[in-house]
């Protein structure tokens, strides 16, 4: 005969704390079981050619979440963005090209075309149009190639371009700042505009990073491109600031063209994810540009960014027309009330190919 020994079991009811711990343990093991079951049946994601990014619009992890501070609730931008109206962004902003007038201009244009080719190759950019039919009509586009772009490809191009576009203003502003210090003289207002331009381009980049997460390969490309471009622009600006400003003016022409083509793609129905009414501009963009309620779609965001690029085009073509060591910055200068159109921070009197020196000095 076998004798069985049974341990004593307490007949007292569980305390509230013990019951809570037991329920948490049961829930944890149940969730783990569901996750392991799903992992066995989930399809394997396909590989991507250019980047290891995992999403087009960020829904989970934020690349740069706002830090949690006990006392600081909000930090205002150092350079508040000037207001743009929808009418201004649609009627005053369009693709335009300034024809080179001397050897310096031709060198700048040649360098931009080479950089454009390198960027197209690096980002796999292939579009179904070459350019707008005429400079004054941003919507007159004729397809000449099969359509090969998508929301993801456009975001790849945006992120790569904006990561480079923020370099010239910072380099030029830094060099002029240092020259003002060692020369013991004023800079005539150029530094602020150049640094504000770099800040604005960085805001473009941060906005797109709210919608797209680059992979390690693209991050490596950005690192290499920034190193090469920063040092090259640094040396060129020491040698010929005028050529560098003309270079940036031509570079911004390409940026205006890029955003014009992407807006046209969106309006023609080639980018359905961005046309979805539920796809809204990130809060970062809404606050920076002051986007009004009802005008916060991806299309509206691209119009704002294109207007910024058109402004940089005007500023740098104008600075390229001035005497680099003598003339004041016309975009922060005050003019008489009797003057009609005049340069400023907004796009009310936007000149696509820049102001000539005799118009502003």
UniProtKB/Swiss-Prot annotation:
The main enzyme category here is oxidoreductase
Locations of Basic and acidic residues compositional bias? Answer: 335-345
| GO MF annotation terms | alternative oxidase activity; metal ion binding
Which cellular component appears as one GO term in the record? mitochondrial inner membrane
| Textual note on the cofactor | Binds 2 iron ions per subunit.
GO process annotations (BP) = alternative respiration
Q: Which domain of life is it from?
A: Eukaryota
Q: Cofactor(s) for this protein? A: Fe cation
- What are the protein's UniProt keywords? Electron transport, Iron, Membrane, Metal-binding, Mitochondrion, Mitochondrion inner membrane, Oxidoreductase, Respiratory chain, Transit peptide, Transmembrane, Transmembrane helix, Transport
Which cysteines bridge via disulfide bonds?
A: none
Q: Where are the transmembrane segments?
A: 155-175, 221-241
The residues that hold Fe cation 2 are 201, 252, 309, 312
Q: What is its EC number?
A: 1.-.-.-
> Chief localization class?
mitochondrion
Residues reported to bind Fe cation 1: 162, 201, 204, 309
Location in or out of the cell? Mitochondrion inner membrane
CDD domains found in the cross-reference section: AOX
Provide the residue span(s) of the region labelled Disordered: 320-361
What is the documented function of this protein? Catalyzes cyanide-resistant oxygen consumption. May increase respiration when the cytochrome respiratory pathway is restricted, or in response to low temperatures.
The family note in this entry says: Belongs to the alternative oxidase family.
Q: What is the recorded name of this protein?
A: Alternative oxidase, mitochondrial
